[in-house]
C-alpha cells in the first residue's frame, strides 16, 4: 500500500534469561571462573559486523556443557573490558580477588580475559602472587563463542583442567595449533601473543610450553607446585617507561620519554643494543633511576659484554634483563618499584617467578 504509515506499537525487550542453579556434584573438583571481558565473553553484532562484550561470566559458563562433566564451576564476574582497556588497577583487582577465592573457597581459578594484553595481566599476577595454593589459569578466545569456528570452548575446558592440577603458578592456556585438538600451557611470565588472529597465537621464546592438555594434562617442563597459602603483594608503580631502540631514536626523544620517570626498561636490538649517541643520556638517567635492558628478539638473550656500547652501558649503571620479554620486564619493574624500591636494579637481573629462562645462551 503506497504512503501507508507504520506505527511502532511496542519494542521487544532483550531477554537476559535466568541462569539455572546448578547442583553440586559430589566427587568433582571445584573451580571458579573470573570474568573480565574480552572476545571470550563477546558476540558478533551481525548488523555492524563488530564484536563487543555481550555475555556474563555466568552465561559463558553455562554455554559450555563440557565443564559440568569435569568440575563444579562457580562464575565470579569481576569486570567486562576489552583487554586493550586493562590498566594496572585491574591487575591488582584480579590478584586480590584470586587471593580471596583461594583463601575462602580453595578453588583453582580460570580467568577469562582478552588475548591482546593477556600476557601483561598474567605477568602482573605472577609477580603479585609469587606463591599460590591453587592454580590461576588465564584463557581467552581469538573468535567469539557464537561463531562456529570459535576456539573459546576448547580453551575454556583446557584451562579448567589445568586449574584442577598442582600447578603452583600463573599460566595461560590457549590452543596449541590451529586444530581443535590440544591446549598448550604457557608460563605467565614467559609468553607473548605472536599472531593477531590465529588460534595458536601464543609462544614462549626460549622455553616452549609447560605442558599440553588433551584428554588429560601432561606437564613436560619443570614448574612450581602449589603451596599451603597464597601470598599476595599487590600494586604497581605506574610511572615506568618502556623505550624501544630504533634507528630514528634521538636524545631529545629519550629525554622526553624518560624525564620524571621512576624507572626505564629498554627493549634493545640484538644483544641489547642502543645507539651510541644515546649512551650519555642513558647514563644520566641511570644516575637517578633504575635502567634495565632486554632484547626485542624472540630468541637468545642480552649480552652487554660482547660489544663496546654494551660495556659502556654497564659502566654507566644500566643492568641486563637477559631474555626477559620487554612487556614482562616493564611489569616486573613496575612491581619492584612498588615493593622493593631500594633493590630494583639488583633484582631486575634475578629470576623471581620464572621470567628469565634457563636457556639464555648464545648460539
Residue ranges with predicted function:
Residues 34, 56-57, 62-67, 184-273, ...:
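Accessory alpha-helical/coil subdomains and C-terminal extensions
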Residues 35-41, 113-119, 178, 269-273, ...:
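Gly/Ser/Thr-rich loops at beta-strand to alpha-helix junctions
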Residues 103-118, 259-271:
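Short acidic, glycine-rich surface-loop motifs adjacent to enzyme active sites
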Residues 111-134, 274-282:
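Short Gly/Thr/Asp-enriched flexible loops that form oxyanion-binding sites at enzyme active sites
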Residues 139-214:
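Internal gly/pro-rich beta-alpha loop/helix module
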